[in-house]
Amino acid sequence: MSVRAVGRVLSMALLLIICLPAWAICRLFGGGDFWVRFYLGCVAWLLGLRIKVEGQPVTGKALYASNHISWLDIPAIGGTVPARFIAKSEIAGWSLIGWLAKIGGSVFVRRQKRSEARVQADAVTAALHEGRPLVLFPEAGTGDGVKLTPFRASLFAAANEAGVIVQPVAVDYGTRSAEIAWPDGARFANEVKRMLNRPAPVRVVLHFLDPLDGATMDRKQLAARTHAEISGALGLS
């Protein structure tokens, strides 16, 4: 790894050593969310992300539905809003990454098991009732930064059943989107190294678009509407 990459890794490790005890103490009193957001925000900055927020993020019981370009989307969004992430179940077993995801309150789902779609939606519904926003990447994978892939509708059922707001979120790296994108089939470790070695800061705009009433739309309508709104914000429609 380059000197830049080593410096970033050491800085993130030191930051974790500082934040983790503070998070643990706050958890004893039912808190800790601030430290998760603070850590992710610092990680985003260390990785060269310069974040601009457009629109007003909703708070409380809500589902953010976002396009997914890179693993950098997670510190970008998680460092901006106090939200938990819906993640594929495999991540729970990824040593350090899985451990950090659990600390952050991620909800793990098995998306490949269509037979368990009802169970997964129920788990997300229960998490929404806890009052902290959830982030869903309905493409169920990363895009190429040029176009949106179709949104999977199954987990939108949770928003309908919980009767919560669904807010489309467009993550936009501008002309750098294709460069930042996680290529299909690329290994996670290789993508981490690539981003750690990347020299120049990159501007990312988080567009928090007009919220939708999840109680009045079914899962397919929510998937179609959020896809259309995000496509429009990114200039892809």
In which residue ranges do the predicted regions lie?
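A transmembrane-helix-recognition feature enriched in membrane-embedded lipid enzymes
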Residues: 1-52, 99-104
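Conserved H-X4-D acyltransferase segment
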Residues: 36-89, 100-101, 144
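Residue-level preference for the first positions of well-ordered beta-strands
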Residues: 61-63, 106, 131-137
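Membrane-embedded segments
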Residues: 74-123, 128
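A cross-family acyltransferase "interaction/gating" segment
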Residues: 96-98, 145-221
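Polar-ligand-bearing catalytic/cofactor-coordination segments
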Residues: 108-110, 209-215, 229-231
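Catalytic-site beta-strand/loop segments enriched in glycine and acidic/polar residues
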Residues: 127-156
